[in-house]
Every structure is written in C-alpha cells, then in structure tokens.
C-alpha cells in the first residue's frame, strides 16, 4: 500500500529502449542529480504503462521520497501486477527530464553508461523497475510458454507426421464420395451405419496412402510437390509407415466388416491393395497407372451404396462410380501436366510427358462423359430430372476448360513440330481448379435432387403416383 504524508513529485520517464533496455536505465540514473521535492502533492501515485517490458518502449512511473524531510519514507513503485518497494535513499534523475527532452536524455544516458557508477539503492530501484512482475506471475508465464512449446514439439514429432501419411485432403474427398453415395441410395439409412462407414473408409484410405508414401521416399524427394512428405523428411521411417498402414488398414476393414457389412469391407480392403500395391508399382512402369488410379477413386461410391444394403447390380450405383472414375482424368491430367518435368525427372511414367496430346485428349473425353452419367442418375431414379439441368452447368464449365486445354496443347504440339518455341499451357491450371470445384458441386446437387427428397413439400410426381396405383 502507499504510505501517507509522503511528499512526492509525480514524474514519468518514458524511455525508448531497444534490446539493451536495462543498460539504458542504469545509465539514466548514473548521469543525473537529485531532484528537489515539494510538499504540495500528497498521496500521489502513478501506475505503469500497460506494456510488456520486453517491448522496445518502456514506461517507468515512479514516486520520489522527500530526502530533505526529517522522516524519510520508503519509495513506492506500483506496476500493473505488483508493488515494488525500494529502501530509503536518494533516487536521482535528470533535472532536464521533461517531456520534450526524454528521447535525447535516453540517448545520452546510453552513451555514458560505461563511465558512470551507481549506488546500491539506485541499482536496486532500477532492477525493480525493469522486473516488477511478481514471482508467481513470471512462473505462470514461463510455465505457459513451456507447455505451448512442448505441445508444438509433440505435434511435430508424434502425431502430425502420421496424419500427413494419410494424405488428409485426399482422404476427405474419398470419404465425402462414399458418404454422398450412401445418402443417395434408395434404401433405408442409419446413423450408426454412416458412422462406421465414415471411420472405416477414412482408415482404409489412410492405410493405402501410407503404403504409397512408404514405398516412394527416394522418388518423392525429387519433386517439389512431394518432398515435404513425412517419410522424405525423415519424420517417420518407411517401416513405421508400413506399420501405421497395417494398423489403420486392419482397424478400418474391421470397422467396415462388423459395423457395416462384409461387401463394404471387401471393397475397402481391395482399395488398399489396388492403390498401395498395383497403382504405386505401375507409376514407374506404364501410363496405364492413371486408369488404375481412377478405378481406386470409383470404389468409394460403391462402398457407400452397398453400406445401406443396396445391390451393386443397380445401374445407379455404377453411374455414381462412373462419375468419380471419369472425374479423375481432367483433374489429374491437368495437375500432372503442370509438373510433368518433375514426374519425368523422378522416373514416374505419366501421360503428361510421355504423350502430351493424349493427356489433353483423355482429359477432354472424360469431361464430356460427365453429361450422360448425370443423365443416367436421373434416368435410373437416383435423382430427379432437375438434376440434369443444373448439373449440366457445372459439367459445361469443366468441359469448356478441358476443351481449351486440349486446343492449346494441339497448338503447342504443332509449334514444337515446326521447331518453334511455345509457352506453358495456361489452361491446365484453370482446368485443375475447375475440377476441384466441380466434383463437390455435382455431388451436392445430386443430394439436393435425390429422388423423392421434396415429395413432402411438392407431393409425389406423376410417375410415383402411377407406380403406387399399379402396386
């Protein structure tokens, strides 16, 4: 608390400090003389500027005791966290420490720090001034920093590399395609089935991706796109990646088997084998690897359809699978074109550099195939006929960029044959990002237009009424 009957002179020294803030403060006190104190102000106190002491600006509020009075009261120093007391004595400061001269005073103090000497009282005060936090608060701050650092190190060295092994963004896309198909099935659905389908599909996808990374660190290190993967960086070893893949694959398949049904479990296990085994091997053998990879992408919709007990012989299930299969080509062919030189350097046999014309032509061909596949979903009563209309907008958008990509590639091939220079195909990137938006958009529209979705609001269609009457 502040002591009464102590005459003080309210003085605030606002000193601009850099890393040597303590030295500047010491120099400030050593190069000054005593300031006389009057008795006109009683019970005055000043609170410190609410700013971290580590900042380049430090405000030092302090009160001066009356050294001329018979009774010398202890100096009171009040900060925003604690009250620091200094033993009686003469605390000195510059007689010219007025507001306009503060910056000049701090500069002069810093230059004369090595030539000055200070009394124990002055030194004690300044030490208190620059470290006026309580011990409890300092310990709490240090403990919080240590905990945050430990959490960050734990994340970087323990679970983050294993999450990266699963290729989270790709896994999310795989899970969403399975969930969308599950939502579109005409059979009854349940929350429990959906939960097991989601977890099991995610674990199976993560297992396949971990096997893929564990087998290719030497080649992934040659590509900018893949050199940051955990096995390449040494965050996990290939054996650890394979162990992780074995655990997640086993748990994922078991979740699908016991929580959904054996058909879905078989499809999940086959996807691990196709992606982690056949596709990864073919990447360095033949361009057919892209078609095998597309089959891998087509399996999750079949898993979602079968999860509700729907028959895999239903044409609607294969329209959904075909949708995912066809989408792979404009998406991946545009992606691989942009980094075709890196694929070639790493030894991956991709159509983008083996046969650029075929690469662009295949991308356009399968982009156009999206139109009849969406019509098929309506024809086989998976969606209503309005889906054909609005899905055609997204299909036309992606098909347009696929066409421009193919057209420009033909021009580039002609220029190369004539021995002329040509620039990078600018439509590859546009097609890639167009495909990223296209697939979620089409799946969302399909769920909105699911057959019978809006019968509660608009009533059943004429076809549904005829079916009801005939039955």
Swiss-Prot record:
Record's catalysed reaction(s): heme b + (2E,6E)-farnesyl diphosphate + H2O = Fe(II)-heme o + diphosphate
Pfam family for this entry, one: UbiA
Major place of residence: mitochondrion
Keyword terms of this UniProt record: Heme biosynthesis, Membrane, Mitochondrion, Transferase, Transit peptide, Transmembrane, Transmembrane helix
Subcellular location: Mitochondrion membrane
Membrane topology reported for the UniProt record: Multi-pass membrane protein
Listed PROSITE patterns: UBIA
Transit peptide: 1-60
Transmembrane segments: 188-208, 247-267, 287-307, 312-332, 368-388, 430-450
Record GO terms (molecular function): protoheme IX farnesyltransferase activity
Entry GO terms, CC: mitochondrial membrane; mitochondrion
Organism domain of life: Eukaryota
An individual GO BP term: heme A biosynthetic process
CDD domains: PT_UbiA_Cox10 (cd13957)
UniProt key word Mitochondrion: yes
EC number: 2.5.1.141
Record function comment: Converts protoheme IX and farnesyl diphosphate to heme O.
Family of this protein: Belongs to the UbiA prenyltransferase family.
NCBIfam families: cyoE_ctaB
The protein's name in its UniProt record: Protoheme IX farnesyltransferase, mitochondrial
Organism of provenance: Yarrowia lipolytica (strain CLIB 122 / E 150) (Yeast)
């Amino acid at each position: 608390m502040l002591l009464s009957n102590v005459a003080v002179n309210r003085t605030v020294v606002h000193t601009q400090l850099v890393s040597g803030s303590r030295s500047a403060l010491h120099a400030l006190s050593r190069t000054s003389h005593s300031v006389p104190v009057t008795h006109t102000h009683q019970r005055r106190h000043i609170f410190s500027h609410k700013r971290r002491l580590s900042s380049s600006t430090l405000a030092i509020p302090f009160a001066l005791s009356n050294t001329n009075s018979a009774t010398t009261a202890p100096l009171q120093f009040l900060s925003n966290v604690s009250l620091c007391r200094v033993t009686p004595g003469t605390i000195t400061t510059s007689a010219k420490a007025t507001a306009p001269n503060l910056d000049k005073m701090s500069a002069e103090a810093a230059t004369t720090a090595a030539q000055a000497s200070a009394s124990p009282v002055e030194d004690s005060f300044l030490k208190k001034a620059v470290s006026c936090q309580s011990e409890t608060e300092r310990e709490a701050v240090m403990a919080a920093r240590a905990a945050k650092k430990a959490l960050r190190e734990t994340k970087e060295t323990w679970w983050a590399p294993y999450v990266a092994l699963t290729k989270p963004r790709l896994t999310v896309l795989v899970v969403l395609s399975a969930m969308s198909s599950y939502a579109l099935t005409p059979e009854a659905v349940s929350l429990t089935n959906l939960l097991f389908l989601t977890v099991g599909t995610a674990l199976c996808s993560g297992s396949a991706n971990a096997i893929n990374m564990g087998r290719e660190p030497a080649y992934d290190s040659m590509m900018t796109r893949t050199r940051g993967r955990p096995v390449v960086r040494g965050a996990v070893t290939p054996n650890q990646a394979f162990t992780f893949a074995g655990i997640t694959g086993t748990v994922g398949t078991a979740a699908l088997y016991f929580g959904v049904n054996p058909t879905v479990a078989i499809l999940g296990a086959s996807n691990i084998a196709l992606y982690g085994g056949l596709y990864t091997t073919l990447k360095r053998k033949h361009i057919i690897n892209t078609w095998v990879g597309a089959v891998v992408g087509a399996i999750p919709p079949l898993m979602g359809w079968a999860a509700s007990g729907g028959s895999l012989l239903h044409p609607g299930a294969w329209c959904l699978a075909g949708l995912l299969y066809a989408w792979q080509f404009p998406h991946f062919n545009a992606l691989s074109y942009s980094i075709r030189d890196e694929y070639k350097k790493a030894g991956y046999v991709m159509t983008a550099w083996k046969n650029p014309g075929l690469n662009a032509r295949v991308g356009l061909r399968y982009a156009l195939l999206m139109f009849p596949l969406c019509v098929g979903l309506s024809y086989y009563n998976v969606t209503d006929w309005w889906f054909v209309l609005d899905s055609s907008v997204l299909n036309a958008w992606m098909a347009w960029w696929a066409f421009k990509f193919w057209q420009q590639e033909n021009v580039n091939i002609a220029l190369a044959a004539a021995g002329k220079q040509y620039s990078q195909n600018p439509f590859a990137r546009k097609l890639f990002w167009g495909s990223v938006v296209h697939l979620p958009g089409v799946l969302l529209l399909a769920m909105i237009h699911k057959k019978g979705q809006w019968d509660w609001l608009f009533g059943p269609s004429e076809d549904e009424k005829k079916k009801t009457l005939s039955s």
